[in-house]
Design a protein with these regions (language model features):
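A generic alpha-helix propensity feature with a strong bias for hydrophobic helices
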Residues: 136-138, 146, 152, 174, ...
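Selected transmembrane alpha-helices and immediately adjacent juxtamembrane segments
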Residues: 163, 171-174
Length: 308
């Protein structure tokens, strides 16, 4: 007869991209794929499901914490941009300001929110910021299954424009389209994620430039599917826009608008699990060709205890 145990968690989200955060720094927690899937399931009455499950372990090197990341399908992945901001805010609430977060995709320096009581304040200085790893564009670093000298124009589907490929801690394909992005991720995301050129799969981003430094973005996350927002997707899209010259942006600042941002514009009064609360539902990315930083809102939803 198998034994059950309870495990404490905190439910958080970054622009609707939601997480179950388990702090295992004092009491070790090792979850199998089936347990991850159970906690992430949308019909789980305790957690309400999640896109990613984040387990915090003692650091492996010189950081403050090691963040283990699982997608809803039980697969372990290297990076999660929104999740990193959530963990930065979580640790700041416990007294660790500007924590250093280790991940499989690299070590992240953070700038924790100045006011943890108001993570959704209108002043972006109060929102967690993450200094991301240097983007990698070499075909072996992404990685791609075939050697390609130019990874900025990779054909993944005959009906779509070429993709800009980049690794920002995890692999991404960014496809710019002229008109709106609505429906494209749902239509093509799963097929492109499994493309033969992508031995480890990839997150798939459909982007459209809609303003001087504004990019509309829809993302299909590897192992999670459609997502309300993707932090690493926002970073990958800013990198692509910079190198492809999509935006004449002398400040190297990009405002990335995920689906929830468009929903907010349509309904200013909307408030779902603390996602908006009056702040801009955008991810702000700064990229100068080398250094990459992303900043955006996160929210605490509730604390709970699940039985495994």
């Amino acid at each position: 007869m198998s034994q059950t145990r309870s495990i404490a968690f905190t439910k958080m989200n970054g622009l609707g991209n939601d997480f179950v955060v388990i702090d295992a720094r004092r009491e070790a927690a090792s979850l199998g794929a089936a347990q991850v899937c159970a906690l992430a399931a949308r019909d789980n009455a305790v957690t309400n499901g999640c896109d990613q499950l984040l387990i915090l372990h003692p650091p492996r090197n010189t950081g403050d914490v090691f963040m283990q990341i699982f997608n809803a399908d039980g697969s372990e992945v290297e990076a999660c941009g929104n999740g990193a901001r959530a963990v930065a805010a979580y640790l700041a609430r416990l007294g660790t300001s500007a924590p250093v977060i280790e991940t499989l995709g690299g070590t992240l320096q953070t700038q924790a929110p100045a006011q943890t009581a108001d993570l959704q304040g209108a002043d972006n200085a109060h929102l967690p910021a993450i200094i991301m790893p240097t983007p990698l564009r070499g075909w072996q670093d992404i990685p791609l299954a075939e050697e390609m000298p130019d990874t900025s124009h990779v054909t993944l589907h005959r009906n779509l424009p070429p993709a800009f490929m980049v690794n920002v801690g995890n692999p991404h394909a960014v496809i710019f389209v002229e008109s709106g992005t609505a429906g494209l991720a749902a239509q093509y995301g799963f097929e492109l994620e499994k493309n033969r050129l992508l031995p480890h799969g990839a997150n798939v981003n459909f982007a459209a430039c809609t303003g001087e430094n504004i990019i509309e973005l829809d993302t299909w996350e590897r192992g999670a599917g459609l997502t309300p927002a993707c932090g690493t997707g926002a970073c990958a899209t800013a990198v692509a826009a910079f190198h492809l010259g999509k935006i004449d942006n002398h400040n190297n600042e990009f405002r990335i608008q995920p689906p929830c941002s468009r929903a907010q514009a349509e309904d200013k009064s909307r408030n779902q699990s603390g996602i908006y609360n009056g702040t801009s539902a955008e991810i702000f990315v700064n990229y100068d060709g080398t250094s990459l930083t992303q900043q955006g809102p996160v929210a605490f939803e509730f604390d709970g205890e699940a039985v495994l």
